[in-house]
């Protein structure tokens, strides 16, 4: 199922105008296989230095597939033990980004934590990112805010939404039930 993002450009009941920067939302069985074709589109074809940010669990869940589909993809695989959307998670990803050097675009492969860390860096680096969620565990995949715990305090950082979301239902089906349940309660 391809979502027509233009349907979200209608006036909002809150009276405010909300900007939509997501070009594509694809939710389907096997959706991940569309990644190579999407990357060939004119808006992304010039992106030569792509980096995937994931953790060890999400690498197994979908990162290996992304890596196989995108030749030359560099990766940052974070340690999932005690990984949180906080200054430590941000610093771990930054270390990997610094080691890689030039980056044109990122691909977040994971759920809320990985997405918040990725969107934080994409905003700071002024580059786009793609979203490949591995579980329907949060409702904020297209958020423009990185919700973090910073030095022990909850804080919302201005960030960017992904330009493309590729939500593969075959991957979601394999996610732990507790993650899906947390997504239902996040709504």
Locate predicted features.
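A generic local secondary-structure boundary/capping motif
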Residues: 41, 119-120, 152-157
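A glycine/threonine-rich phosphate-anchoring loop and its flanking beta-alpha core
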Residues: 125-187
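ATP/NTP phosphate-donor binding region
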Residues: 1-105, 182-185
């Amino acid at each position: 199922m391809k979502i027509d993002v233009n349907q979200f450009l209608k006036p909002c009941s809150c009276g405010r105008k909300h900007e939509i920067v997501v070009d594509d939302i694809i939710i389907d069985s096997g959706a991940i296989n569309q990644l190579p074709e999407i990357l060939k589109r004119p808006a992304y074809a010039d992106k030569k230095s792509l980096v995937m940010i994931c953790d060890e669990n999400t690498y197994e869940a979908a990162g290996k597939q992304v890596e196989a589909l995108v030749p030359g993809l560099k990766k940052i695989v974070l340690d999932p033990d005690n990984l949180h959307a906080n200054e430590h998670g941000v610093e771990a990803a930054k270390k990997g980004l610094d080691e890689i050097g030039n980056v044109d675009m990122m691909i977040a492969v994971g759920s809320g934590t990985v997405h918040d860390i990725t969107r934080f860096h994409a905003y700071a680096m002024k580059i786009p990112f793609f979203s490949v969620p591995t579980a329907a565990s949060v409702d904020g995949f297209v958020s423009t805010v990185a919700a973090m715990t910073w030095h022990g305090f909850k804080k919302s950082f201005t960030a960017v939404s992904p330009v493309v979301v590729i939500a593969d239902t075959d991957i979601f089906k394999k996610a732990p039930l507790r993650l899906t349940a947390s997504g239902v309660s996040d709504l």
